[in-house]
């Protein structure tokens, strides 16, 4: 006979489900999420205050993350007000199909969109000049973002950094010319496609503060060729198709105007090539949300695959300081290592710590399990068993264990997750299945009361209940 008893702390285990806690004030509830526990159907209520502390869904491929985000987004878009804006970074086009409708704003390179929905014609200059008093700072930030990957992953960062300054010089000179005919993506692309270095030097020489940029392209030498080829290559790569038009749409202005859904459609086929543009678009959404002069309304930012947008310049501020400005981030992540690789271990840890509401689905890598176990902490347990030598009787051993042991995670089925909020005891839940906007979710995923047979050291599995 064996027996385990917690003497310090608590444990999340399959037979001991904990009641889902919920706020009592129904007027403040933004999300009403029915879930299944061993006690039956209960509800997770998320208020606007709790959403302002952000939501993270962590889990492997096919574990149920997107289903959860669908359930959350469906309730958010159903209650959007003229003071709110919802921005969705859509990696597979699924969110646009599920939640898009005529009048929504779509930024992306997709050639085929659902009926009645048109792609916005983005104008990079409009986003730079939206704040007349901060044009210089805005442009510096835009150029830094566009060249970030090249600067970080180049053995000789001089060339991408010089090319960045050159792009800044051309764009700021164009802005100062006040010639509206050249203040668009198409004109910028055409300028660099037919670049004449002598005319470029002449353009930069018109302004004293841009003369330093001329040093990069002095003479006909290897340095000049390297810098010019770097900037031309980037412009040709990122300003293509839908992003190379004579547009007039500013994504920051769309956020500022509110009352809309904005979709940033990621093109998986050329995602790595266009990564600087997608990063720039989402960074400007975050920047606009953090620079709002009014706290009225909410800015919901949904990121289905967090790791596809490494090095977002404003994500840490958005997570840690956006709460008072109505910023509410819902992010999906496949594993923790992706965040460590994208942002570095310490920066990633700081960003992840800003998410107060967490849904941990089944993960398949040790790094993610370790992160979850260390986040939830340890407990002390007494393990009692009958000695094989009868004269010794019962033997008790005290050991330290994790709140969530590996065997618990091994048995999580698709659609089940560990729900955790700071300051509250975590609970294992089964989520319903999203069936479409306006439809009641199906209680497809449910959890039967499950026990661990300590005598045989085996675990009985979950039962799927419809």
Located regions from the model:
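N-terminal accessory nucleic-acid engagement/regulatory domains that precede
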Residues: 1-16
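Conserved ATP-driven motor cores of ASCE-family P-loop NTPases powering translocation/secretion/packaging/pilus
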Residues: 319-321, 325-421
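P-loop NTPase motor domains
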Residues: 2-6, 21, 27, 34-42, ...
């Amino acid at each position: 006979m064996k027996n385990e008893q917690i003497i310090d702390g608590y444990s999340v285990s399959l037979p001991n489900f904990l009641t889902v806690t919920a706020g009592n004030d129904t007027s403040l509830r933004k999300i009403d999420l029915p879930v299944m526990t061993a006690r039956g159907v209960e509800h997770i209520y998320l208020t606007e205050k709790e959403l302002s502390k952000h939501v993270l869904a962590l889990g492997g491929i096919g574990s149920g993350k997107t289903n959860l985000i669908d359930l959350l987004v469906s309730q958010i878009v159903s209650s959007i007000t003229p003071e709110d804006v919802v921005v969705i970074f859509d990696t597979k086009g699924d969110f646009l199909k599920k939640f898009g409708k005529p009048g929504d704003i779509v930024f992306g390179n997709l050639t085929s969109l659902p009926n009645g929905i048109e792609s916005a014609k983005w104008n990079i200059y409009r986003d730079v000049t939206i704040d007349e008093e901060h044009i210089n700072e805005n442009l510096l930030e835009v150029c830094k973002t566009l060249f970030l990957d090249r600067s970080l992953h180049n053995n000789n960062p001089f060339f991408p950094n010089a090319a960045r300054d050159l792009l800044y010089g051309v764009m700021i000179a164009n802005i100062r010319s006040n010639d509206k005919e050249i203040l668009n993506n198409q004109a910028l692309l055409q300028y660099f496609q037919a670049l004449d270095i002598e005319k470029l030097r002449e353009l930069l020489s018109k302004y004293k503060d841009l003369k330093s940029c001329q040093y990069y392209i002095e003479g006909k030498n290897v340095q000049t060729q390297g810098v010019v080829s770097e900037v031309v290559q980037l412009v040709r790569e990122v300003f293509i198709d839908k992003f190379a038009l004579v547009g007039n749409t500013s994504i920051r202005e769309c956020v500022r105007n509110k009352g809309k859904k904005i979709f940033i459609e990621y093109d998986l086929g050329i995602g790595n090539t266009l990564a600087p543009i997608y990063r720039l678009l989402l960074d400007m959404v975050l920047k606009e949300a953090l620079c709002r002069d009014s706290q009225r309304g909410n800015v919901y930012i949904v990121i289905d695959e967090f790791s596809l947008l490494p090095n977002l310049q404003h994500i840490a501020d958005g997570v840690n300081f956006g709460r008072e400005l109505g910023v509410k981030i819902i992010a999906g992540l496949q594993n923790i290592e992706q965040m460590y690789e994208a942002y570095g271990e310490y920066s990633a840890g700081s960003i992840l710590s800003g998410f107060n509401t967490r849904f941990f689905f089944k993960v398949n890598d040790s790094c993610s399990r370790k992160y979850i176990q260390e986040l939830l902490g340890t407990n002390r347990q007494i393990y009692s068993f009958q000695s094989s030598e009868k004269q010794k009787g019962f033997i008790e051993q005290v050991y330290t264990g994790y709140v969530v042991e590996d065997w618990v995670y091994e048995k999580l089925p698709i659609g089940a997750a560990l729900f955790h909020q700071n300051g509250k005891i975590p609970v294992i839940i089964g989520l319903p299945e999203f069936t479409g906007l306006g439809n009641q979710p199906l209680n497809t995923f449910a959890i039967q009361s499950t026990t661990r047979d300590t005598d045989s050291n085996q675990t009985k599995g979950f039962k799927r209940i419809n």
